[in-house]
């Protein structure tokens, strides 16, 4: 094993990125601006990131020979999505470091582990029950009541892998509809709005957070993000401090997106994503340093940049041919005073 470890990457070093979609594309562009090369590993042909990266390997995540060659060709590996097979990580980790860490991935890939982790830190989530059988589903419904939401523990995103339960829902049919997988039932949260915080942590433990953004979703997909969010000063402080605590507890390196519900002035954590986040695209036009550069800085061992916001922002997300396009519009430029 020839594990490559380096606190600070030198100019011209290569950063490997798992996933070649839009986020991988933006990470590659940020890396290039900082003087780094990128190597994309992606199963699909001609992904967006391949157009701006130094190298591109098209292969499945179970193609261990190509994974090993990929990992041996780079100085560090990061990723644009969290549902990476464990076997792929095993191969890569023998060759070089992976940031963010596997612990962060492991927790974020499993909704049950994620909620237990958050609760252990002393923070609030929706009430929940583990569901591994039809009998456990019936018990969970009796305990949490309806409305409630039944979700797969793994591989769910953008509203996929979940179903809302009402008073007339049939547990037997619901159990069959989700494929009898490992599930989690979450109690209903009566919230006024949703927010997210994009935070980052460097190799030397420096933590920085962008201002919280207020998000609007439709059918489980992000539509708009508005900054500043509708929060009290204390809520804003709490959201940032909670994000910082999660980063510190995971010994995290890179950018993270933490999503919250605001319910009766209380912050309830929905989930976190161990990667650059769709609700953080506004930072490209609204901040001195955006989330993509911040992530590359962190995984490369550089100091974090200035995350200060220089204008109010409304980000509208449109979808064309199933690909997201963000238009970030400053809603008010700061005064010259």
Across the structure, where does each feature detected by a protein language model lie?
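Active-site "cap" helix and flanking loop/linker of ATP-utilizing ligase/carboxylase catalytic domains
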Residues: 237-258, 263, 273-319
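Internal nucleotide-binding/catalytic subdomain
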Residues: 165-258, 262
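Conserved small/polar residues in nucleotide/adenosyl-binding loops
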Residues: 320-327, 337
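Protein kinase-like catalytic core scaffold
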Residues: 208, 267-271
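A short linear hydrophobic-aromatic micro-motif
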Residues: 127, 147-149, 182-186, 256-257, ...
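A conserved helix-loop-beta module that forms one wall/lid of the active-site cleft
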Residues: 101-163, 168
């Amino acid at each position: 094993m020839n594990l490559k470890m380096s606190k600070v990457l030198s100019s011209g070093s290569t950063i490997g990125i798992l996933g070649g979609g839009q986020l991988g594309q933006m990470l590659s562009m940020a890396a290039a601006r900082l003087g780094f090369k990128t190597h994309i590993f992606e199963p699909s042909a001609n992904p967006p990131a391949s157009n701006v990266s130094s190298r591109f390997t098209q292969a499945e995540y179970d193609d261990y020979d190509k994974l090993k060659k990929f990992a041996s060709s780079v100085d560090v590996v990061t990723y644009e999505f969290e549902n990476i097979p464990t076997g792929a990580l095993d191969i890569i980790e023998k060759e070089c470091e992976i940031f963010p860490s596997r612990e962060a991935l492991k927790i974020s890939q499993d909704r049950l582990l994620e909620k237990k982790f958050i609760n252990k830190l002393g923070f609030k989530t929706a009430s929940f029950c583990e569901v591994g059988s039809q009998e456990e589903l019936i018990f969970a419904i009796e305990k949490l009541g309806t409305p409630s939401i039944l979700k797969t523990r793994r591989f769910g995103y953008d509203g996929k892998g979940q179903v809302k339960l009402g008073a007339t829902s049939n547990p037997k049919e619901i159990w069959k509809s989700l494929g009898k997988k490992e599930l989690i039932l979450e109690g209903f949260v009566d919230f006024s709005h949703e927010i997210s915080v994009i935070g980052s942590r460097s190799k030397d433990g420096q933590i920085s957070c962008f201002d919280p953004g207020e998000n609007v979703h439709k059918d489980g997909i992000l539509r708009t993000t508005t900054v500043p969010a509708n929060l009290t000063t204390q809520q804003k402080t709490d959201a940032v401090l909670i994000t910082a605590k999660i980063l510190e507890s995971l010994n995290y390196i890179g950018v993270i997106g933490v999503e919250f519900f605001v319910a009766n002035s209380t912050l309830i954590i929905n989930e976190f994503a161990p990667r650059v986040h769709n609700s953080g695209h506004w930072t490209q036009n609204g901040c001195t340093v955006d989330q993509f550069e911040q992530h590359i800085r962190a995984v490369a061992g550089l100091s974090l940049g200035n995350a200060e916001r220089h204008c109010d922002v409304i980000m509208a997300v449109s979808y064309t041919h199933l690909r997201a396009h963000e238009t970030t519009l400053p809603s008010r430029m700061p005064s010259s005073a």
